[in-house]
Amino acid sequence: RECRSQSKQFVGLCVSDTNCASVCLTEHFPGGKCDGYRRCFCTKDC
């Protein structure tokens, strides 16, 4: 199962999953994706 948490450090509109994932790595998450509202959500297995 995958858990999602909105990124605390991502700034601006999320248009690139790669950029989102890079910011999430600095927040100690293994990955991240943009959602439909252009926000960055960090993901991890839970």
UniProtKB/Swiss-Prot annotation:
UniProt keyword list: Antimicrobial, Disulfide bond, Fungicide, Plant defense
Any one GO biological process: defense response to fungus
Signal peptide: none
InterPro entries: Defensin_plant (IPR008176), Scorpion_toxin-like (IPR003614), Scorpion_toxin-like_sf (IPR036574)
Keyword flag Disulfide bond: yes
Disulfide bonding pattern of the chain: C3-C46, C14-C34, C20-C40, C24-C42
UniProt-listed PROSITE patterns: GAMMA_THIONIN
Biological role: Plant defense peptide.
Similarity field: Belongs to the DEFL family.
Name of the protein in its database record: Defensin Tk-AMP-D6.1
Source species: Triticum kiharae
Lineage: Eukaryota, Viridiplantae, Streptophyta, Embryophyta, Tracheophyta
